[in-house]
């Protein structure tokens, strides 16, 4: 049963590894000026998320045997969330950055609500082991994904800037490793 997830799941950490390699070697980075301060924005992180987060959702939806409309809705909300987060990171004024962060975070909340509602319904028709695994993976994603906008707003990409770039990058890396490699380890 779990073998059908191997191919899809292996692309999640593989894509993240490529993105982190590009960031580590100085690519996937752009500088923007916000209030006279130059900020390093790792756009490769968003490229990674644009690929890997839909794959995580597809994996989870396939496990629960959700229908196509559910999968399309989850992926559509996810793509909008990532793109609006990137727009916020690239915005040159603090107020606009906060607005885009708010839009992206609202999309995240709506996505997570839809994820719970739709996957509970789909998984309810599956075996107890599938329901349990779906619930575990879903809850794992919810907890981890709720941390991303907090790191964003407190870090250099947000306007608060309480945590420096290296701490922000490390926090995103830990979240990504847990959400991607951890997810795959639990699923497979």
Show where each model-derived region lies:
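Polytopic alpha-helical membrane-helix bundles and their juxtamembrane interface segments
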Residues: 1-44, 53-188
